[in-house]
């Protein structure tokens, strides 16, 4: 078999392939054995028609399409290996000739992985990260944890404050008319949560139980219900009940409830400070990696094919659907609630998908440029790490994966990321960032 690759514009080209006559004849023989089982010819049992009779009655050409179906997968795969191209999408194949006793030729229009023109990826400026835990950050975490132990208590007197949870009835109007979905009774709303239309929650602050208030808002221009987007609305609202959070005082007993390894408030604070500091160090390391990766990718020049973006979008939509399932929703329900459809979701994700593809291509190109290799020992260490992380045996991981190619690639990319960070130049955060 012979194959030649002719590059065209962009990331497209034509793969021209010639399959030897002996392989063609063998495929035609296989096609006959398959087709003859389905043929009825008077005077012969089904599946027992002699080859000469079949060809006389139907012509050998009747076998060509099945022969092509047999030949193409193997021939196309061998042609890819021979030319070294990296297709990123299904090809458009045109069989130019097939005949018994002769070579078969076909052409495949193929979109291939783009060439990556690497820019600077060593000596990148990466901002230093502040890993010192402040007393304010520690107290904020303590308050957050105590908040989980808070009890909701009915506020007998007094008005709504930020952080209260209120039970309300509301009836929404646009242009003096009620609109679908704008009414509810006995609805619980946490003031300050930002879960309602901007401006709604703030206007309830100061209202008391039993009081009514007209809340005037404007729907955002990007609101999912197009018929309401950008329109002014009035919600006639009644406050049925106000509850506030009764947050417990931090005592030794509460400290032990929050952290079973702490017997006193001081021990709890010490343990929490240690955990938060470790998390801050991890976050700082991840932020530096992300900044180095983004800069290396931005410095590279790549013409990303639409096919690769669409493949990445498929993966991202699937991941999004899995996250929705974890929250008890499927994609169909999400689309109904959000007023979106899949095409709109994909459009929102498109830029991120392109960035993902560009980043992966850049990291792979750096690995190639630096001749980064992965040893069997590297793979074994990664498998052991995965085994500890997921509490699954190494053998079970191997069986699930089928092979270690994915692990090998992950380790190779991680080595590239380590290289980027090791070669990076740490700089002080800009003034604007440090004041943020």
Swiss-Prot record:
Give the catalysed reaction(s), semicolon-separated.
[protein]-peptidylproline (omega=180) = [protein]-peptidylproline (omega=0)
Which portions of this protein are annotated as coiled-coil regions? none
Q: What PROSITE patterns does this protein's entry cite?
A: FKBP_PPIASE
Q: What is its main location?
A: cytoplasm
Cell compartments where the protein resides? Cytoplasm
Entry EC no(s): 5.2.1.8
Q: List the Pfam families.
A: FKBP_C, Trigger_C, Trigger_N
Task: Pinpoint the PPIase FKBP-type domain residues.
Answer: 163-248
Q: Which InterPro entries match?
A: PPIase_dom_sf, PPIase_FKBP_dom, Trig_fac, Trigger_fac_C, Trigger_fac_C_sf, Trigger_fac_ribosome-bd_bac, Trigger_fac_ribosome-bd_sf, Trigger_fact/SurA_dom_sf
List, alphabetically, the GO terms of the cellular component aspect: cytoplasm
**UniProt keywords, alphabetically:** Cell cycle, Cell division, Chaperone, Cytoplasm, Isomerase, Rotamase
The record's Gene Ontology biological-process terms are: 'de novo' cotranslational protein folding; cell division; chaperone-mediated protein folding; protein transport; protein unfolding
Query: Highest taxon of the source?
Result: Bacteria
Gene Ontology molecular functions: peptidyl-prolyl cis-trans isomerase activity; protein folding chaperone; ribosome binding
State the similarity comment. Answer: Belongs to the FKBP-type PPIase family. Tig subfamily.
Question: HAMAP family per the record?
Answer: Trigger_factor_Tig (MF_00303)
Q: What does the entry's domain section say?
A: Consists of 3 domains; the N-terminus binds the ribosome, the middle domain has PPIase activity, while the C-terminus has intrinsic chaperone activity on its own.
Role played: Involved in protein export. Acts as a chaperone by maintaining the newly synthesized protein in an open conformation. Functions as a peptidyl-prolyl cis-trans isomerase.
What is this protein identified as? Trigger factor
Q: Which organism is it from?
A: Staphylococcus saprophyticus subsp. saprophyticus (strain ATCC 15305 / DSM 20229 / NCIMB 8711 / NCTC 7292 / S-41)
Give the taxonomic lineage as stored in the record: Bacteria, Bacillati, Bacillota, Bacilli, Bacillales
């Amino acid at each position: 078999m012979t194959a030649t690759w002719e590059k065209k514009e962009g990331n497209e080209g034509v793969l021209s392939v010639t399959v030897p006559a002996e392989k063609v004849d063998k495929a035609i023989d296989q096609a006959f054995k398959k087709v003859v089982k389905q043929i009825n010819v008077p005077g012969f049992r089904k599946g027992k028609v002699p080859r000469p009779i079949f060809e006389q009655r139907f012509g050998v050409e009747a076998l060509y399409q099945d022969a092509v179906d047999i030949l193409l997968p193997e021939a196309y795969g061998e042609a890819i290996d021979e030319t070294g191209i990296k297709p990123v999408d299904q090809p458009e194949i045109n069989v130019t000739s097939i005949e018994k006793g002769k070579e078969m030729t076909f052409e495949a229009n193929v979109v291939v992985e783009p060439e990556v023109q690497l820019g600077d990826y060593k000596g990148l400026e990466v901002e230093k990260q502040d890993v010192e835990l402040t007393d304010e950050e520690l107290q904020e975490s303590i308050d957050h944890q105590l908040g989980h132990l808070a009890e909701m208590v009915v506020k007998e007197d007094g008005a709504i404050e930020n952080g209260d949870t209120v039970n309300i009835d509301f009836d929404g109007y646009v242009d003096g008319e009620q609109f679908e979905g704008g009414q509810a009774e006995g609805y619980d709303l946490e003031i300050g949560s930002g879960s309602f239309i901007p401006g709604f929650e703030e206007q309830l602050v100061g209202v008391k139980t039993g009081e009514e208030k007209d809340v005037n808002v404007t729907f955002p221009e990007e609101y999912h219900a197009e018929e309401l987007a950008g329109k002014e609305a009035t919600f006639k609202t009644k406050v049925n009940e106000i509850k506030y959070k009764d947050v417990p005082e931090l005592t030794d007993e509460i400290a032990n409830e929050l952290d079973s390894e702490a017997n006193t408030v001081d021990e709890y604070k010490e343990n929490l400070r240690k955990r938060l500091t470790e998390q801050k160090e991890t976050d700082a390391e991840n932020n530096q990696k992300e900044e180095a990766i983004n800069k290396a990718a931005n410095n590279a020049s790549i013409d990303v094919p639409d096919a690769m973006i669409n493949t990445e979008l498929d993966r991202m939509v699937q991941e999004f659907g899995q996250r929705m399932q974890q929250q008890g929703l499927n994609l169909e329900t999400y689309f109904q609630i959000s007023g979106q459809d899949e095409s709109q979701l994909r459009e929102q994700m498109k830029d991120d998908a392109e960035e993902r593809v560009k980043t992966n291509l850049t990291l792979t190109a750096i690995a190639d440029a630096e001749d980064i290799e992965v040893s069997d020992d590297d793979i074994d260490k990664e498998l052991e790490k995965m085994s500890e992380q997921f509490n699954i045996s190494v053998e079970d991981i191997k069986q699930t994966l089928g092979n270690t190619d994915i692990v090998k690639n992950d380790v190779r990319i991680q080595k590239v990321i380590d290289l980027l960070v090791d070669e990076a130049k740490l700089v002080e955060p800009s003034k604007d960032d440090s004041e943020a």
